[in-house]
Each structure stands twice: as structure tokens, then as C-alpha cells.
Amino acid sequence: MSQGVEFNRLMLEMRSMQMEAMAKAKPVQAPAEAGAPSFSEMLSQAVDKVNETQQASTAMANAFEVGQSGVDLTDVMIASQKASVSFQAMTQVRNKLVQAYQDIMQMPV
């Protein structure tokens, strides 16, 4: 019988704590940090960085093709692979954004 009373007391305490927590509820909104970039700015910076990587890879490949000194084939291949990986990552991010948009648009209202 003692366990039944203990259980009821515990449940009453939990309910009172729940009601207290619900009374203190505030809307979820993170404070805006000064100088923090927005999502669109971050995405734009990422696209610009991928573009710079691809342009650097192309410039290095062109320099190797014309026989410019100081440009090694291994450096050209590494730059090419960096550009390829960064472009593939950007493509995957785009795909995830499109999928998230489609999921949100298909949600019932």
C-alpha cells in the first residue's frame, strides 16, 4: 500500500512541475547575434568559395598545359579533385534544400 501512495505523490509532483514549466514557456527565438551572417549570406559565400576553387583548378591546369615552370602534375590533380569534391558537396546541399522545400510544401495545413 505504501508504494501506491508514493506513486500518487510522485505523479502529483510531476504534474505540478509540468504545470509550472508550461506557465514559464516562452516562444523559441534565438537572440540575433551582432554580425552573424544570415543563411542566404552563408550559402552565397559557400557557392563563391566553390567557384573560386574551380577557377583556381582551371587556371592551374591551363598553366600546366602551356608548360609554365613551377606547376606540377600532382598539384594540378589535387586542385582538380578539390574542385570536384567541393562541387559534389554543393550539389548534395542543393538536393537536400530542394527536398526539404518539397517536404514542407507537401505538409497538410
Curated annotation (Swiss-Prot):
One of its GO terms (biological process) is bacterial-type flagellum-dependent cell motility. Keywords: Bacterial flagellum. It is found in: Bacterial flagellum basal body. The keyword Zinc-finger does not apply. GO terms for molecular function: cytoskeletal motor activity; structural molecule activity. InterPro entries: FliE (IPR001624). Its main location: other. GO terms for cellular component: bacterial-type flagellum basal body. Pfam families: FliE. HAMAP family: FliE. Belongs to the FliE family. NCBIfam families: fliE. This is Flagellar hook-basal body complex protein FliE. It comes from Pseudomonas aeruginosa (strain UCBPP-PA14).
